[in-house]
Amino acid sequence: MRTQNNLTVEVDCHSLGSNECPSMTSSFSPMDSPTPTPTSIYSQGSLASPGWQDAGSYPGHAYERHTGATPMRSAFRLAGMTSNENMGMSYGAMEAQERMPMPDFLSAYDDNVEHFWLPSDGPKTYETGTHSLPYPHTLPQCPPMVRSNYRPHAAYLPEAATNPCLSRSIFHHAERVPQSMSMGNMMPWIPQATESIAPQTIAPSQVGPVTPPPSYSEFPTSIQTFKTHSPTTPLRSCSIGTASGPDTPISRLSGGAADYLEDFQQSPPFRDGLNRLQRQPSRKMIRKQSSRQNMSLENLPSIIKQVQFKCKEPGCKGRFKRQEHLKRHMKSHSKEKPHVCWVPGCERAFSRSDNLNAHYTKTHSKRGGRNRYVATLDESSPDYDPDFRGQLTPDGLPIRGSTLDDPMPNSREYSVDGLDD
């Protein structure tokens, strides 16, 4: 039968105040814990389990506030561990002679204490997940960057985001380069001669063809400008180092913009695209060239067609498109005037009937004129009758039943020698 003994742990708190270190002297029975563990001595309420909020000296000491002499006088000494020391004592892989028996510390555990062996001078390396006490997670350990002023506790950023040589474009004018991009500020980024950088290589399966930008139709016009422009800025003239591989972006910066453009010109996609542009002009250029050819005098269509009918009368320059027009025009040159005005006393003759009708309308259908008024030719008169042919009164009214052969009434002569308008 196992004898139950009480273990008394005394903690010297002379260096701490009464509020900070309450009485830690109490009786503890190891058999009260169902599963004896090394940390079970903190679960009875007599010895407060140390938390990270109580560790005032973190990261210096992980378990207690070390302000004076060592507070714990017992052999179970846990103070003096740093923040990166291990709390899970890895005793399983140690030799049996290097282990320190647990009954030396806790006399109540007489048997079956194989899993309570603690190393006397075991390595104190921190291993995540080997202890039950909470521990703040730190940032993941990243490979150190090759820099002369590398800070191990700084947050890791990609090289392209922190290196000014890679975060800005190389195609900048000299006046646009800020003062922070001077050669003196870039010296910390340049690796020293003693440091070596592993060549950055890319597998052949990952290397894709170099394709020009979408607007490469405008790119050839500016190639000569880049070639003739001498590098004056540190970004174009400085060499970032020879340890980098031949295909890295850093090697592109060592030669400046001209080398990169020469390599870009030699790429097959660029040559094919340039040749295609030279062989196949755009539709806009084709339309422009065709419009210029059409505007030439030789290709202009004849706006006025060549007339086929000309007046043969000497001195007449009449030109007509139709035969009937020429025939009507030739009557004006002849002496024949078959169309005569029927109004008594007028007797005007015209070579064309349309001219006679115009004479009736303009000369004899108006009152107050020099010519004789005829009521039968006036559309506004109640006696309007364009087919009437006979004698008229002195006022121009028609004499119904008379003919042109009848004598004029009252033997009165009317001057009807009107002039055409």
Swiss-Prot record:
Signal peptide: none
Pfam families the UniProt entry points to: zf-C2H2 (PF00096)
InterPro entries linked: Znf_C2H2_sf (IPR036236), Znf_C2H2_type (IPR013087)
This protein's UniProt keywords: Activator, Conidiation, DNA-binding, Metal-binding, Nucleus, Repeat, Sporulation, Transcription, Transcription regulation, Zinc, Zinc-finger
Major site of localization recorded for this protein: nucleus
Disordered, as annotated region: 379-421
Disruption of the gene: reported phenotype: Leads to delayed conidia development.
Induction conditions: Expression is controlled by flbA, flbS and fluG.
SMART domains: ZnF_C2H2 (SM00355)
Zinc finger feature spans (C2H2-type): 309-333, 339-364
Top-level taxon in the UniProt lineage: Eukaryota
One biological process term in Gene Ontology: sporulation resulting in formation of a cellular spore
Cellular component per GO, a single term: chromatin
Compartment list: Nucleus
UniProt-recorded Gene Ontology molecular function terms: DNA-binding transcription factor activity, RNA polymerase II-specific; RNA polymerase II cis-regulatory region sequence-specific DNA binding; zinc ion binding
Task of the protein: BrlA, abaA and wetA are pivotal regulators of conidiophore development and conidium maturation. They act individually and together to regulate their own expression and that of numerous other sporulation-specific genes. Binds promoters of target genes at brlA response elements (BREs) containing the conserved sequence 5'-(C/A)(A/G)AGGG(G/A)-3'. Required for conidiophores formation. Controls expression of abaA.
PANTHER family referenced in this protein's UniProt entry, alphabetically: TRANSCRIPTIONAL REPRESSOR PROTEIN YY, YY2 TRANSCRIPTION FACTOR
Protein name, per record: C2H2 type master regulator of conidiophore development brlA
Lineage: Eukaryota, Fungi, Dikarya, Ascomycota, Pezizomycotina
Name of the coding gene: brlA
